[in-house]
């Protein structure tokens, strides 16, 4: 029972991994889940550099996982542009 509870909690926290860590991932492109595309609130990203505004932050283009992302050179583990999520 305890193991089941722990697994449920981990599965619930999985989409919010970027709240726990802000590590850069340099490797294969990751997919952006559809629910993140629907969370648009206010523009904090520069649309001229290919970032997509979402919940006071932005996620990186799948075509450019190592750059072209809100004037940064990489993305966090959950596709957030560093330094924009809580601006």
Curated annotation (Swiss-Prot):
> Which interval of the chain is the signal sequence?
1-19
Gene Ontology cellular-component annotations: extracellular region
Entries under InterPro entries matching the protein: Conotoxin (IPR004214)
> What the protein does?
Mu-conotoxins block voltage-gated sodium channels (Nav). This toxin reversibly blocks voltage-gated sodium channel in cephalopods (tested on squid giant-fiber-lobe neurons) with an inhibitor constant (Ki) of 15 nmol/l, with no alteration in the voltage dependence of sodium conductance or on the kinetics of inactivation. Has no effect on sodium channels of the two gastropod S.luhuanus and A.californica (which are not natural prey).
The protein's organism comes out as Californiconus californicus
GO MF assignments: ion channel inhibitor activity; sodium channel regulator activity; toxin activity
What family does this belong to?
Answer: Belongs to the conotoxin O1 superfamily.
Entry protein name: Mu-conotoxin cal12a
Query: Please, which domain of life does this record's source organism belong to?
Result: Eukaryota
């Amino acid at each position: 029972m305890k193991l089941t509870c722990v697994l449920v909690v981990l599965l619930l926290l999985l989409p919010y991994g970027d709240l726990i860590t802000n590590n850069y991932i340099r490797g294969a492109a990751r997919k952006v889940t559809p629910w993140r595309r629907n969370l648009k609130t206010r523009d904090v990203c520069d649309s001229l550099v290919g970032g997509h505004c979402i919940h006071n932050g932005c996620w990186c283009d799948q075509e450019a996982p190592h750059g072209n992302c809100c004037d940064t050179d990489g993305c966090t583990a959950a596709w957030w542009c560093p330094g924009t999520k809580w601006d």
